[in-house]
């Protein structure tokens, strides 16, 4: 009897997002991977929660031209909440993510991946929350496929070293990926 070869399963390879395109605004920015880190005050001292543990935050990129993707989560287009942040301004220079507060539901954007493929998204919602009162769903994982973009907004709070609000844009993949 002839042996039947069992096909090997194709290993899963996570697509790495490399560029975010705000297609209707003709603006693009590179994306770099970041992780979760301890929050620190302006002097570099750890900020502690009520139990004395360091407060954890998503890393950012020190540039107005580059977005940060939380690599511990899914890539945009995979099941779950792909989180990307960027600066509204950096060292008094307007950042690429300054467009977020002007976006509207239905507006399109695209993500290019390290393999050259592209996935298109449409804005589902645009919300502004205070830094002290933004909902947990912004950073939580989900069963649906979504990309959450985050940037600062509002007045600068020098005591906290950040703006007092956050703009949160949630985008979902377009059903028709043939749209350009």
Q: For each predicted feature, which ranges?
A:
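Solvent-exposed, non-transmembrane regions of membrane-associated and secreted proteins
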Residues: 1-180
């Amino acid at each position: 009897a002839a042996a039947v070869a069992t096909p090997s399963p194709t290993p899963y390879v996570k697509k790495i997002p490399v560029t975010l395109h705000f297609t209707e605004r003709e603006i693009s920015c590179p994306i770099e991977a970041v992780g979760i880190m301890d929050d620190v005050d302006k002097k570099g001292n750890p900020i502690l929660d009520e139990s004395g543990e360091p407060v954890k935050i998503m890393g950012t990129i020190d540039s107005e031209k580059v977005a940060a993707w939380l690599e511990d989560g899914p890539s945009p287009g995979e099941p779950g909440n792909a989180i990307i942040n960027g600066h509204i301004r950096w060292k008094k220079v307007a950042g690429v993510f300054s467009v977020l507060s002007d976006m509207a539901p239905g507006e399109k954007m695209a993500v290019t991946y390290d393999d050259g493929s592209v996935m298109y998204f449409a804005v589902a919602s645009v919300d502004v929350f205070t830094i002290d009162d933004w909902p947990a769903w912004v950073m939580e994982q989900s069963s649906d496929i979504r990309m959450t973009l985050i940037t600062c907004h509002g007045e600068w709070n020098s005591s906290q070293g950040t703006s007092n609000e956050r703009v949160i844009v949630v985008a979902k993949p377009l059903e028709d990926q043939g749209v350009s």
